[in-house]
């Protein structure tokens, strides 16, 4: 994989004096494993890469994208974006941002361990999670799915106004969905663990959480009606906040 920022710079070198150019370069990969009853049910890996170019000339904007990271293709995207701008409607407010002089924060979001993590080890984590849930309680009747998912992404942005930024991050998670039963009563529950690298995942915590949530309401009975203080589960609270934040987002009125 070429240096993303250097690729963006080389595209910018082709910009003319009467236009503004923004180049976005990205590369990423995602792998997912699902197991069921001790065997692999699904194993997928998807990799993406590309260069996006925006050109602003005489108040007209043109865009183009190419799904490759080689320099000739990236430069061709600039030519296409330039050509597309010729047919765009004039927007007197169109323009690129100027550097504000503020250094972006340095965030520790990348773990090299994940990028080179063997596929066999990914499968092993999903299988072990399923095994722990099954053995966690005799009332567990089935593990619907046990998943391991990871991915990484790298991006670079460079503009003719002098902005240059890069970002890269990794992430992974384990997720398990279990069904528990006692007589005719059946309940479900799930557990998960997230991290920047496989070594940061907590198998035991995910398994225990799934077993607990699947079994704790077995045999439960409806409570009498009353005015009481409601204590919300943290996941329920997060869901409610997610709904509210979406409705209050400025993007809803743009």
Predicted regions, residues:
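Active-site bordering "gate/hinge" segments
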Residues: 1-254
């Amino acid at each position: 994989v070429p240096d993303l920022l250097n690729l963006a710079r080389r595209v910018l070198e082709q910009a003319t004096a009467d236009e503004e150019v923004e180049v976005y370069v990205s590369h990423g990969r995602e792998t997912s494993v699902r197991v069921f009853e001790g065997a692999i049910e699904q194993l997928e890996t998807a990799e993406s890469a590309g260069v996006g170019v925006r050109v602003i000339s005489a108040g007209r904007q043109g865009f183009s994208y190419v799904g490759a990271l080689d320099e000739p293709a990236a430069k061709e995207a600039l030519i296409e974006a330039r050509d597309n701008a010729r047919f765009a409607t004039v927007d007197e407010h169109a323009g690129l941002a100027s550097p504000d002089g503020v250094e972006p924060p340095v965030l520790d979001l990348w773990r090299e361990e994940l990028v080179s993590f063997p596929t066999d080890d990914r499968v092993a984590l999903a299988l072990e999670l399923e095994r722990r849930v099954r053995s966690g309680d005799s009332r567990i009747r089935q593990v619907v799915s046990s998943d391991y998912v990871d991915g990484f992404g790298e991006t670079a942005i460079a503009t003719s106004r002098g902005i240059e930024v890069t970002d890269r991050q990794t992430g992974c998670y384990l997720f398990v969905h279990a069904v528990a039963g006692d007589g005719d009563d059946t309940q479900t529950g799930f557990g998960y663990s997230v991290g920047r690298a496989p070594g940061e995942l907590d198998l035991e915590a995910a398994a225990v959480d799934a077993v607990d949530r699947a079994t704790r309401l077995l045999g439960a009975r409806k409570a009498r009606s009353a005015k009481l203080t409601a204590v919300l589960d943290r996941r329920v609270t997060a869901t409610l906040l997610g709904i509210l934040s979406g409705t209050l987002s400025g993007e809803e009125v743009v």
